Curated annotation (Swiss-Prot):
The chain crosses the membrane at residues 18-38, 63-83, 99-119, 137-157. The gene is VMA3. Belongs to the V-ATPase proteolipid subunit family. This is V-type proton ATPase 16 kDa proteolipid subunit. Its main location: membrane. Proton-conducting pore forming subunit of the membrane integral V0 complex of vacuolar ATPase. V-ATPase is responsible for acidifying a variety of intracellular compartments in eukaryotic cells. GO terms for cellular component: proton-transporting V-type ATPase, V0 domain; vacuolar membrane. The lineage of its organism: Eukaryota, Amoebozoa, Evosea, Archamoebae, Mastigamoebida. It comes from Entamoeba dispar. Gene3D superfamilies: lithium bound rotor ring of v- atpase.
Length: 176
């Protein structure tokens, strides 16, 4: 009986929910930082374009919309990871996978938000002066958004895989 309790303690320590919670936090915090940066940086360009050409403001909102979607990716991953966290049946393996998933989604979202902000600001200003640049700006924004989408997909895969067993199996106990 003591071997079974020791195995359960080794596979599911009391501190494993901490790592899962850090993954949840990283997912939402970094994606929101990325979305906020993208929105703020693009808004500066939209404001300056609005002074020169007020009729171009509605077409200039694409970077803000793209940046807002990044926060949704983080929120969805946050909810999926939160469902995984359960103190009584939450293994250290699962906790590290959840931490990795949160960091993957969060940091990809942060990089994407920075890319959207910079390319959105320059793209909006350039498209206001030369309307032919509007399509180029949209393509740059789509590829910048894809960075966050890659992290989102990998985070969902990480959240769906892995072992959450707190009981040692024959393969686990024989390798020790």
């Amino acid at each position: 009986m003591s071997v079974l309790l020791r195995s359960v303690t080794e596979l599911c320590p009391v501190y494993s929910p901490f790592f899962g919670s850090m993954g949840i936090t990283a997912s939402i915090v970094f994606t929101v930082f990325g979305g906020a940066y993208g929105t703020a940086k693009s808004s500066v360009g939209i404001s300056s374009v609005g002074v020169m050409k007020p009729e171009f403001i509605m077409r200039s909102l694409f970077p803000v919309v793209f940046a807002g979607v990044i926060g949704l990716y983080g929120l969805i991953v946050c909810i999926v990871l939160f469902i995984n966290v359960n103190k009584s049946e939450y293994s250290l393996n699962r906790a590290f996978l959840d931490l990795g998933a949160g960091l993957t989604c969060g940091l990809c979202g942060l990089a994407s938000g920075m890319s959207i902000g910079i390319s959105g600001d320059c793209g909006v200003r350039g498209a206001a002066q030369q309307p032919k640049l509007f399509v180029s700006m949209l393509i740059c924004l789509i590829f910048s958004e894809a960075l966050a989408l890659y992290g989102f997909i990998v985070a969902l895969i990480m959240a769906a895989t892995g072992d959450n067993s707190c009981v040692a199996t024959a393969s686990t106990s024989s390798s020790s």
